[in-house]
């Protein structure tokens, strides 16, 4: 039985590392779970996000660097949605809404869940990794 103990400890340690790495990968998004007082000022998302010590940290991110407009629809990854989208607003603390100009010259209402775009990294709002972009390559048009 003692011969199994070191192998079991090694296996348990490896399993713990795998679980921790998976949970940290998921922690890159869903900023709304750990950020409060979130508001949108133009293209700047601001709020207080919990840091590694468990304390709130005032932080912001310029969404214009990470979100674009594809024919009247908000798109991530992308950039410069602000040049062709108007009436930007934040609903429910995590849903970006805007009216974006399409190829037809008309404006189309669009929305995007920012939990797939923004994460909390040690108290700082940061863009999600590109692998998470598969969830929101194109946003919904209403």
From Swiss-Prot:
SMART domains: CVNH (SM01111). Keywords: Disulfide bond, Lectin, Signal. The keyword Calcium does not apply. Disulfide bonds join 29-128, 35-49, 85-100. Residues 1-27 form the signal peptide. Pfam families: CVNH. One of its GO terms (molecular function) is carbohydrate binding. The keyword Disulfide bond applies. It comes from the Eukaryota. InterPro entries: Cyanovirin-N, Cyanovirin-N_sf. PANTHER family: CYANOVIRIN-N DOMAIN-CONTAINING PROTEIN, CYANOVIRIN-N HOMOLOG. Belongs to the cyanovirin-N family. Mannose-binding lectin. This is Cyanovirin-N homolog. It comes from Ceratopteris richardii (Triangle waterfern).
